[in-house]
């Protein structure tokens, strides 16, 4: 998609509460991740809610534009980059939504895609619980990115990937 098609994103700007960017600098900044690849997107969207994400998907479907979810952009497989719409969850959708302790060594949590692994580590500090996937990008890896790529780390051989 070229710069001449930027005006189609005006329609999307009227449907989402989050931020939408088509400028060259921001597109360049989102053209790479932790891999060796560089692919410049047509648009970057920072959604503020799941309703925003629904509208982005509807828009992308209507115009047959690919979507690429992005967390911290620390992955090594190129999953966070692409020529279509990059949906960056780190700016607004980055909260823990709930936590339930099951026992001293078990619990569950619900979070938005931009919630960082390091924030969960800090939350669990002092307890006997931990999240064993332990990606190499450590504290700034996001759960959306980790789940989207089935990330793993040093403990994955014993406990499995995300």
Question: What does each of the following model-derived ranges do?
Answer:
Residues 12, 35-67, 85, 89-135, ...:
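N-terminal glycine-rich flavin-associated loop
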Residues 145:
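Beta-strand-loop-alpha "switch" segments that mediate conformational coupling across diverse proteins
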Residues 70:
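Conserved PLP cofactor-binding pocket of PLP-dependent enzymes
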Residues 1-34, 40, 59-67:
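N-terminal accessory segments
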Residues 137-139:
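Internal maturation/activation junctions in enzymes
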């Amino acid at each position: 998609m070229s710069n001449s098609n930027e005006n189609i994103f005006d329609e999307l700007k009227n449907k989402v509460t989050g931020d939408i960017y088509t400028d060259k600098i921001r597109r360049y900044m989102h053209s790479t991740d932790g891999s060796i690849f560089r692919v410049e997107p047509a648009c970057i969207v920072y959604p503020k809610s799941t309703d925003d994400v629904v509208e982005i998907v509807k828009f992308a479907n209507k115009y047959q534009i690919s979507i690429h979810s992005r967390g911290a952009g620390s992955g090594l497989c190129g999953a966070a980059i692409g020529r279509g719409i990059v949906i960056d969850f780190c700016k607004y959708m980055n909260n823990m939504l709930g936590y339930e302790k099951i026992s001293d060594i078990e619990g569950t949590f619900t979070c938005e895609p931009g919630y960082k692994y390091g924030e969960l580590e800090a939350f669990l500090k002092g307890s006997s619980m931990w999240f064993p996937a332990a990606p190499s990008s450590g504290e700034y890896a996001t759960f959306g990115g980790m789940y989207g790529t089935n990330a793993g780390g040093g403990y994955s051989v014993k406990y499995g990937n995300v």
